[in-house]
Amino acid sequence: MTLDITQFYQTFFDEADELLAQMEQLLLNLDVGSPDPEDLAAIFRAAHSIKGGAATFGFSALTDTTHILESLLDRARNHELTLTKEMVDAFLETKDVLSDQLVDYRASAEPDAAAAATICAKLERLKAESAAGAPAAALR
């Protein structure tokens, strides 16, 4: 007997939509200069949950995009990088790309590869710059 996981897609899509809405609200209310550790943990958990579900269903663009976001959020919550407004703006932009990817997967379409590549490159630059200790504002 083979399990058809497509029957669980709608549940994943609904949960991912809720997690993205929660992530957006937390990011919009985040005090960049002194972020609440609980808020950072909640934002990280939202990204982590979306990534896990996306990987389970084989939504590779969503998995890959969320993985990079998650790694930056993990470093932020572990005090391994200092958040900047540019980072939070990039996280919000990523949330929009993830929302678009969900819409595409829900419609059985492939997500916009160029949009994913653009946001992933931006996140990777932020990740590299924060690892090097250079100001994130230099990325603009």
How does the language model describe each region?
Residues M1-R140:
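Non-catalytic helical tethers at domain boundaries
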